[in-house]
Amino acid sequence: MGPAEVRRSMATRTRFWLGLLALASLTHCAGNPTALTHDAALAPGEGVVLLRVVGNASEPWSQLELAPDTGGTPQTVFAADFAENSSGVFVGKLPAGRYRPVQMKAALQTGNLVTTLEVPLEARLGRFAVEAGRVTNLGTVVYQEYGAMVKMHIKNAVVRSPAPAPSAALLHSQFPAVAAAVEGKPELGWDDPVRAPSPQLVQVLRDGRGQVRGLNGASLAQGGAVWAGARLGALLVRESVRAPWRRIDTGALHEIMAVAPLPQDRILAGGEEGLVVLSQDRGRSWTRLSVVAPERIVVFVGGTASGAVVLVAQGADDLQVWMASDPRSAWRQIGQIATARDRREGVVPGTPAGDDVVRWRTLQHPDFVALTDARLVIYSDERKLSTFDFASQRWDSVETPFVAHHTLAMPDGHLFAMPPVGASMFGSSDWGHSWQKLDYFTFASAPAFASDTTGYLAARPYGTTEIWRMMKTTDGAKTWNEQSELAFMPRKVIVDPASHALLALSVQGETFLSGDDGKSWQAAN
């Protein structure tokens, strides 16, 4: 993507999200007979259906059409606002009867237009029954795209998996009246249930993990390796900034949102639906840990200087913070912090059943949690900065004089914060109790530092065009100088402290490498 394409892409982002918002609003304003509501029980003759979809879709799925075998108009079931990022769980109520999936729909940007991608499901998945007062759990479907989009069509595979959808957790957290009505009743499923992975599923998972999307929570570990989470339970690691990506499979289907390498060849990772997994042999085998409820997304994991481990789990309106002396030992909750909704850059509108007001997926920006040698740092509810002191085991919370979009905490405790649009960068050396104004940008990524004084960030300096620049500081972030114009839209910058080699991750999921102080860039796998 060249500079002209970057300008066009940025200019159309607002139109894209407004189009999605309008699409979601229309579906709910018309009223949806399949929608479940928080306090309403099922009507006589109604049952519940759930289906989870995972994989490498271009956009999140928003609608699932189910046709009754007796004919008539297909029923539309919407994706729930549950603990998912790229995955989706469809849930709704249907009159008792027999049904088959007809198609899935997703809103898709094509040039300057927002259109609907439709994937036919007829004869690809099977049939199922809905009975009054019971749940039909259709489990998990894996979706994989092949090749490029041509005239709103793309070659794809849709395959059933034996993994169940999270019915109990979803119903209890969002629809308690329905959960009480179906409690203790055996769940239904497909007419021909999937009891083991089919050869087609194995192949689709191999294809999907081979071109897996997502570079979540990318960070530089001690020793110089770069780690990131991805879809379909995959981790990505570069043994150095200059090395290629290598994939590690955890065996899960959830998207991995956070990963932390630990001493003694251990790896801790977390993601959708409360997933927490541990490897003690550098990724060759994995054990799932029970730490947080499945209605939360694990958005951060890390190891402290003392050898303890910390994780942060995002809920609908709060964060839970957990800590353990060892991942295999008992975890204890050390904090619960209210959060602001709708802060994520490039937020994706969800269409939770039963809501006439469009809500949004609630993951915060991935740079809002950081570990230092002395404290855990969390920026959460608008102007609130919270730090947990490992020595005293106490929280300290302060109100910031700005709304931050990125936050960064250095190992020595120095903090940096970047407001979302057109404001100064700020720095603090007293855990957020006082702040100093630094340089001024229209937009910027979180900075990456090679030393106390030398750092890099991708930014649009104030007063410039929409082209992003790579910037460098040699005075501890007080002033920044341009190194180069970027032909891609950056999301995160990582620097190797030893060589000053730079790795940049783009919004489109691409990876770029610079070995000359950010002056030139090459695509890197």
For the regions a protein language model found, what residue spans apply to each?
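Structural motif
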Residues: 317-322, 382-386, 422-426, 465-469, ...
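Primarily secretory-pathway and cell-envelope proteins
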Residues: 29-75, 106-209, 512
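Surface loop/turn motifs at the tips and blade-to-blade linkers of beta-strand repeat domains
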Residues: 207-210, 249-252, 290-293, 336, ...
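Residue-level detector of Asp-centered blade-edge/turn motifs that repeat once per structural unit
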Residues: 220-223, 262-264, 304-306, 371-373, ...
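Repeated scaffold domains used in trafficking and secretory/extracellular systems
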Residues: 213-217, 255-259, 296-302, 341-348, ...
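Beta-strand-rich domains and repeat architectures in extracellular enzymes and scaffolds
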Residues: 205-233
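Short Pro-Gly-centered beta-turn/loop motif in secreted/extracellular proteins
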Residues: 86-98, 105-107
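Asp-box/BNR beta-propeller loop motif
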Residues: 232-247, 277-292, 322-333, 338, ...
